[in-house]
Amino acid sequence: DLALWQKQFGDTPLSVSVNLSSRQLIRRDLVSDVRSVIARSSIKPRCLRLELTESLVMDNPEQAAHVLTKLKKLGIGLSLDDFGTGYSSLSYLTRFPFDTIKIDKSFVDDATPKRSVLLRSMVNMAHELGLSVVAEGISDQSDALELRQMGCEYVQSFMFGPPVAGEQVPRLLKEQIAASQPARA
């Protein structure tokens, strides 16, 4: 589907993120399967992103490091999902080849005065390590604006719309592209 959408909306950068399960991560043929999907679908590897949770990586850190390094060599993106909620060490941010962290919704929802300090610290740390940042579970425009001002590149939220089936994506993209075009007089 992604390759078709890329042809249909050539000037619009499109990518897809896929959650990886622990069972998939330990499969011996995972890397060759991903390589095959990329070749078969004719998508650019950089348009595919795999998302893994901290706990998934922690189940077997040596195996995870080995597999993730091979996957990264294919040119795909790797995201550390639910960042900050697991029992990992910050050293894993340098040990594993992630290029993005996804700050867990619990930090965005936190109503304590320390919320902004924690969020800003995570965004700054990620950037210092060369990682991009996605904040999950944004509840309103003020959250989105605050995170943008902190330097968070992406936000993810049902506020922007619910998940949709693949056949609905072209219509949604057309609507978003039309809405982003300047009005003509």
Locations of the language-model features?
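Conserved C-terminal helical docking segment of ANL/AMP-forming enzymes
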Residues: 38, 44-46
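Conserved catalytic network of the ASCE P-loop NTPase/AAA+ motor domain
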Residues: 10, 70-71
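EAL-family c-di-GMP phosphodiesterase catalytic domain
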Residues: 6, 19-28, 47-62, 74-185
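Short conserved micro-motifs at the rims of enzyme active sites and ligand-binding pockets
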Residues: 29-30, 37
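Catalytic core regions of nucleotide second-messenger enzymes
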Residues: 7-14, 42
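Structural preference for long, well-ordered alpha-helical segments in enzyme cores
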Residues: 1-3, 33-34, 67, 122, ...
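Short catalytic/binding micro-motifs of nucleotide second-messenger systems
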Residues: 1-8, 38
